[in-house]
Amino acid sequence: MKQIVIAVCALLAAAALFSGEVAAQGQPNMYGPTVTADQAKSVAAAAVAEARKNQWTMAVAIVDPAGDLVYFEKMDNTQVGSVDVAIAKARSSARFKRPTKAFQDALAAGGEGWRLLSLEGAVAVEGGVPLDVGGKIIGAIGASGGAAQQDGVTAAAGAGTLK
C-alpha cells in the first residue's frame, strides 16, 4: 500500500511540474477545422520548393489535427528512413500543438526536459510545425531528410503559406 501511495504522489508531482511548464509557455492555440486536401498540397509544394532551392532532399507529410495523414510527398533520392520520421514529426506537432523544436530544445536543456522521453508520440527533433489559420491549428507539417535545422526550415516554409 505504501508503494502505491508513493507512486501516486510521484505521478501527481510530475503532472504538476509538467502543467506548470506548459502554463509558463502559454496555452497553445485551439484546434480548428481540418486541413483540406488543397491546403495540404499547397503547403507541401511550398516545402518542397524550399528544399529544392537549397538542394535538399526531403520527405514531407501533412496531417490533420488528430495526426492522421492527409498528404505525403517524397522527393527523389530521399533516404527511406525519412518517410516515417516526417509523418511522426507532423503527428507530434499536431497532437501536442507545438513545433517539435520545442521538444528538442526542452530535451537539450536537460533537467525536467528529460520527462519528454516518457511522452508517447512526442518527437524531439526539429522539423514538425503546426499549421495555423486564424489562430486555429488545422493540422501540421513534418519534414525529414536533412539535418534537423534543414528539416525545420523546410517545414516552416510550408507552414508559412497558410494565414
Where in the sequence are the language-model features?
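Positively charged n-region of N-terminal signal peptides that target proteins for export
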Residues: 1-4
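Flexible, solvent-exposed loop/hinge segments and secondary-structure transition points
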Residues: 22-163
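Bacterial N-terminal signal peptides
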Residues: 7-21
